[in-house]
Amino acid sequence: MRTTIVRSVVSMVLMMVAGLALADEYEAAIRMFKDADASARFFETSYGYAVFPTVGKGGIGVGGAYGKGRVYAQGRYVGDSSVTQVSLGFQLGGQAFSEIVFFEDERAFREFTSGNFEFGAGAGVVVITAAAQAQATTAGSSATVSGGPNNAETMGNRYNKGMATFIIPKGGLMYEATVSGQKFTYTPRN
């Protein structure tokens, strides 16, 4: 029952943002993160990164999020990834955002690409936004999402256990006080 609800909510959110997808959505997302002061320096210092052009998130009591991405190592596209999230707690609404996870070194890259990787509920995320944003962690506690990378303000930007995660909101409205984490899969490029 919960799985059906989560899938339905995520499907609705993904349909809402389907029009945002472009042929070069990965390049556009990477460009947005390179243009944002908070994340730009990580392109020069990281071993690699995983970029998710659109992650759709929604919930009514039970929530979920899903997005497809690509993984890069030393500037080369090396594989594909997906991110999923299931959350429990008070939540209502839907939102879409772009996400990037930087790998500080080869060890962090190997940890992420070794199979199914998870960020716990307390993992921090830096929100790059032109609008007000209360706080963003995978544990929830967000208020509204709007705007984009223009004139961005951020809250801290450093590696945590070899990884640094940033999101740029695309749109939507999500009220939540939830417990959740993100799970990533990785498939090497053929």
Task: Specify the residue positions occupied by each region the protein language model found.
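Bacterial N-terminal signal peptides that target proteins for export
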Residues: 1-10
